[in-house]
């Protein structure tokens, strides 16, 4: 399973997903948590943008780039990773019943929660659970966190659960108050060995909307 996702990440970098994933395979969610909803649905929190990642695989530094779509409503969250050509290469979903990971040409994988599922299936874990709060510029409740703030009381960094979240840029919408500040870019770093992680992982997220 880790090999399949590694090929998907390679496709993000090289733009040759068709060659690596047999016939331009693209994931279609087996159980779409947001089927039938509209983009403007006010009950859904939606983030869309670009990502880049640096990680270590087989003692070699690797990198990947692509786009993402994050949708959230209540306990339901779905993260879709896409190649630069727009192919959906991985879908991570979580609701009250548990978590699901879907990859091209593979049956869905399920577990109690996202982080464990990704670690077991892929060999590393993106902090999907933490991102629910970090995208809102706040630490995840229930676990210790160290927060450094800027002159406007917005977070500069959040250190939590083995990750350091750097708030690099904010949307220039004329409202710089802490309550209404919107994240434009955040960088996430996890050192080797943090939380039992086998290797370092760095992720950059740029939010377009």
Curated annotation (Swiss-Prot):
<dbReference type="GO" id="GO:0009279">
    <property type="term" value="C:cell outer membrane"/>
</dbReference>
<keyword id="KW-0564">Palmitate</keyword>
<keyword id="KW-0813">Transport</keyword>
<dbReference type="InterPro" id="IPR004565">
    <property type="entry name" value="OM_lipoprot_LolB"/>
</dbReference>
<dbReference type="GO" id="GO:0015031">
    <property type="term" value="P:protein transport"/>
</dbReference>
<keyword id="KW-0143">Chaperone</keyword>
<comment type="similarity">
    <text>Belongs to the LolB family.</text>
</comment>
<dbReference type="InterPro" id="IPR029046">
    <property type="entry name" value="LolA/LolB/LppX"/>
</dbReference>
<feature type="lipid moiety-binding region" description="S-diacylglycerol cysteine">
    <location>
        <position position="18"/>
    </location>
</feature>
<dbReference type="Pfam" id="PF03550">
    <property type="entry name" value="LolB"/>
</dbReference>
<comment type="function">
    <text>Plays a critical role in the incorporation of lipoproteins in the outer membrane after they are released by the LolA protein.</text>
</comment>
<keyword id="KW-0998">Cell outer membrane</keyword>
<keyword id="KW-0472">Membrane</keyword>
<feature type="signal peptide">
    <location>
        <begin position="1"/>
        <end position="17"/>
    </location>
</feature>
<keyword id="KW-0449">Lipoprotein</keyword>
<keyword id="KW-0732">Signal</keyword>
<dbReference type="GO" id="GO:0044874">
    <property type="term" value="P:lipoprotein localization to outer membrane"/>
</dbReference>
<comment type="subunit">
    <text>Monomer.</text>
</comment>
<keyword id="KW-0653">Protein transport</keyword>
<feature type="lipid moiety-binding region" description="N-palmitoyl cysteine">
    <location>
        <position position="18"/>
    </location>
</feature>
<protein>
    <recommendedName>
        <fullName>Outer-membrane lipoprotein LolB</fullName>
    </recommendedName>
</protein>
């Amino acid at each position: 399973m880790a090999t399949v996702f590694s090929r998907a990440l390679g496709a993000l970098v090289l733009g040759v997903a068709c060659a690596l994933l047999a016939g331009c395979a693209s994931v279609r969610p087996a159980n779409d948590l947001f089927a039938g909803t509209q983009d403007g649905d006010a009950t859904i929190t939606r983030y869309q943008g670009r990502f880049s990642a640096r990680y270590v695989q087989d003692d070699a530094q690797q990198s990947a780039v692509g786009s993402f779509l994050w949708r959230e409503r209540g306990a339901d969250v779905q993260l879709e990773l896409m190649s630069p050509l727009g192919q959906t290469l991985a879908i991570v979903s979580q609701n009250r019943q548990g978590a699901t990971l879907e990859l091209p040409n593979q049956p869905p994988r399920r577990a109690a929660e996202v982080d464990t599922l990704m670690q077991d299936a892929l060999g590393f874990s993106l902090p999907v659970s933490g991102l629910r709060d970090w995208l809102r510029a706040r630490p995840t409740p229930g676990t210790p966190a160290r927060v450094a703030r800027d002159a406007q009381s917005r977070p500069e960094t959040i250190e939590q659960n083995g990750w350091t979240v750097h708030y690099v840029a904010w949307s220039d919408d004329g409202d710089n108050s802490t309550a209404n500040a919107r994240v434009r870019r955040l960088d996430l770093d996890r050192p080797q060995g943090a939380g039992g992680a086998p290797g370092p992982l760095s992720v950059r997220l740029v939010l377009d909307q």
